[in-house]
From Swiss-Prot:
Lineage: Viruses, Riboviria, Pararnavirae, Artverviricota, Revtraviricetes
Description of how the protein assembles with itself and partners: Interacts with host CCNT1. Associates with the P-TEFb complex composed at least of Tat, P-TEFb (CDK9 and CCNT1), TAR RNA, RNA Pol II. Recruits the HATs CREBBP, TAF1/TFIID, EP300, PCAF and GCN5L2. Interacts with host KAT5/Tip60; this interaction targets the latter to degradation. Interacts with the host deacetylase SIRT1. Interacts with host capping enzyme RNGTT; this interaction stimulates RNGTT. Binds to host KDR, and to the host integrins ITGAV/ITGB3 and ITGA5/ITGB1. Interacts with host KPNB1/importin beta-1 without previous binding to KPNA1/importin alpha-1. Interacts with EIF2AK2.
Region of interest (Interaction with the host capping enzyme RNGTT), ranges: 49-86
Entry GO terms, CC: extracellular region; host cell cytoplasm; host cell nucleolus
Keyword Zinc-finger: no
Binding site for Zn(2+) 1: 22, 33-34, 37
GO terms classed as biological process: DNA-templated transcription; positive regulation of transcription elongation by RNA polymerase II; positive regulation of viral transcription; symbiont-mediated perturbation of host chromatin organization; symbiont-mediated suppression of host innate immune response; symbiont-mediated suppression of host translation initiation; symbiont-mediated suppression of host type I interferon-mediated signaling pathway; viral gene expression
Gene3D superfamilies on file: Tat domain
Region feature Disordered, mapped onto this chain: 1-20, 45-101
Residues that bind Zn(2+) 2: 25, 27, 30
Keyword Transcription regulation (UniProt): yes
Protein name stated in the entry: Protein Tat
Entry comment on modification after translation: Asymmetrical arginine methylation by host PRMT6 seems to diminish the transactivation capacity of Tat and affects the interaction with host CCNT1. Acetylation by EP300, CREBBP, GCN5L2/GCN5 and PCAF regulates the transactivation activity of Tat. EP300-mediated acetylation of Lys-50 promotes dissociation of Tat from the TAR RNA through the competitive binding to PCAF's bromodomain. In addition, the non-acetylated Tat's N-terminus can also interact with PCAF. PCAF-mediated acetylation of Lys-28 enhances Tat's binding to CCNT1. Lys-50 is deacetylated by SIRT1.
Length: 101
């Protein structure tokens, strides 16, 4: 190895900087471009802002921490509560009483 000027900072040593600039490409050649590219692209290590992660849902069986809610009434049927058979009879009665139509 050739001697290096001790007054130079390590990142300014000859040969420490690549001749070409770093790119956003993730091909094998660009991932091995320099040490920075290798750690960020190749290994996926970055010390910048963290990406937002989705929260993991708790397992279904661990509901001991939740306050018990009162049971809701069973779903009520929509529409006529008398049922479809009685409504048909009702329509028949109305048509019998109005023979004018």
């Amino acid at each position: 190895m050739e001697p290096v000027d001790p007054s130079l900072e390590p990142w300014k040593h000859p040969g420490s900087q690549p001749k070409t600039a770093c790119t956003n490409c993730y091909c094998k050649k660009c991932c091995l471009h320099c040490q920075v590219c290798f750690t960020t692209k190749g290994l996926g290590i970055s010390y910048g802002r963290k990406k937002r992660r989705q929260r993991r849902r708790p397992p279904q069986d661990s509901q001991t921490h939740q306050v018990s809610l009162p049971k809701q009434p069973s779903s009520q049927q929509r529409g006529d509560p008398t049922g479809p058979k009685e409504s048909k009879k009702k329509v028949e009665r109305e048509t019998e009483t109005d023979p004018d139509n």
